[in-house]
Amino acid sequence: MAVDITLLFRASVKTVKTRNKALGVAVGGGADGSRDELFRRSPRPKGDFSSRAREVISHIGKLRDFLLEHRKEYINAYSHTMSEYGRMTDTERDQIDQDAQIFMRTCKDAIQQLRTEAHKEIHSQQVKEHRTAVLDFVEDYLKRVCKLYSEQRAIRVKRVVDKKRLSKLEPEPHTKRKEPASEKSSHNASQDSEEKPAAEDLPEKPLAESQPELGTWGDGKGEDELSPEEIQMFEQENQRLIGEMNSLFDEVRQIEGKVVEISRLQEIFTEKVLQQETEIDSIHQLVVGATENIKEGNEDIREAIKNNAGFRVWILFFLVMCSFSLLFLDWYDS
């Protein structure tokens, strides 16, 4: 009859644990430790495809983080007026454009190389589908980063155009007129400073002698009044300036529309290029399959030709034997 010794076994395990704990031995060798050892899985050897795919994803993520980190400095075209984000020059922005385009092209070539190698290697259908899904995900991630870069570049170009438009609309003649006025005021101030000691030396100078000078300043109000010819001339000038500003605004609107259209076409072009790469890969696979089928067909044709040749030989041998048999029978009868 079987005896239940479960309680005895548990007491023994507890005694062993207590003894090991008292002696300072790690408890990993007990029941829990053995269970952990049983359920502990050895790490899977990572393949070259997985490591390279993760490397490409890491590079694309670094490019995305870089673009988002320097977004405000990159798209800001008024670096000379704003001190908060005005830390990047146009040369640095152009360098970022060049490096980003090279980086995206390199990532695209790496994805293409991975796709080619994945199709060349012999694996099960499940592994092929998994790798195709991974490459599609990486390619979609690269498309999103390219779209982010295209949007930032379109915003930058738009702001550069706005900046040029504002620089054209600045009142340059007004600044030129201020210089003679300042020179005139400084010249008048120097004349006043030179005439002041003379006035102190001659306090009894009659008022009538200084009246002509005051008259020239008092007549300034009359000089401000414009004649009808001058008013008409200024109105014509205003109409001409308004027409120029309207034409400039129309040109700016056209340029903005063209910039937006260019960015949209660039995005479509990028998507079409990636789509064409996928189609080229599929066509390549079809061509490879067709080549293999043609090879198999040629081998079948060779075998059929060999079989037909053997069949003809047997027929010829049969006819020859029949002919000799008839000749022998004819000779025998005669």
From Swiss-Prot:
- Cytoplasmic side residue ranges read 1-308
Q: Where are the transmembrane segments?
A: 309-329
Q: Which GO terms describe its biological process?
A: endoplasmic reticulum membrane organization; intracellular protein transport; positive regulation of ER to Golgi vesicle-mediated transport; positive regulation of organelle assembly; regulation of Golgi organization; retrograde vesicle-mediated transport, Golgi to endoplasmic reticulum
Family membership, please give it.
Belongs to the syntaxin family.
Annotated localization: Endoplasmic reticulum membrane; Golgi apparatus membrane
Membrane topology (Vesicular): 330-334
Cellular compartments per GO CC: endoplasmic reticulum; endoplasmic reticulum membrane; Golgi membrane; SNARE complex
What keywords is this UniProt entry annotated with? Coiled coil, Endoplasmic reticulum, ER-Golgi transport, Golgi apparatus, Membrane, Protein transport, Transmembrane, Transmembrane helix, Transport
First-listed, main subcellular location of the protein, grouped into a coarse class:
endoplasmic reticulum
Q: Which InterPro entries match?
A: Syntaxin-18_N (IPR019529), Syntaxin/epimorphin_CS (IPR006012)
Q: Does the keyword Coiled coil apply?
A: yes
Q: How does it assemble?
A: Component of a SNARE complex consisting of STX18, USE1L, BNIP1/SEC20L, and SEC22B. RINT1/TIP20L and ZW10 are associated with the complex through interaction with BNIP1/SEC20L. Interacts directly with USE1L and BNIP1/SEC20L.
- Which superkingdom, per the lineage? Eukaryota
Name of the protein in its database record:
Syntaxin-18
Asked whether the keyword Transmembrane is assigned, the reply is yes
Q: Where is the composition biased (Basic and acidic residues)?
A: 33-50, 166-186, 193-207
Which species is this UniProt entry from?
A: Rattus norvegicus (Rat)
The UniProt record lists the t-SNARE coiled-coil homology domain at 242-304
Membrane topology, as annotated, equals: Single-pass type IV membrane protein
| Physiological role | Syntaxin that may be involved in targeting and fusion of Golgi-derived retrograde transport vesicles with the ER.
Q: Which GO terms describe its molecular function?
A: protein domain specific binding; SNAP receptor activity
Give the span(s) annotated as Disordered: 29-50, 166-225
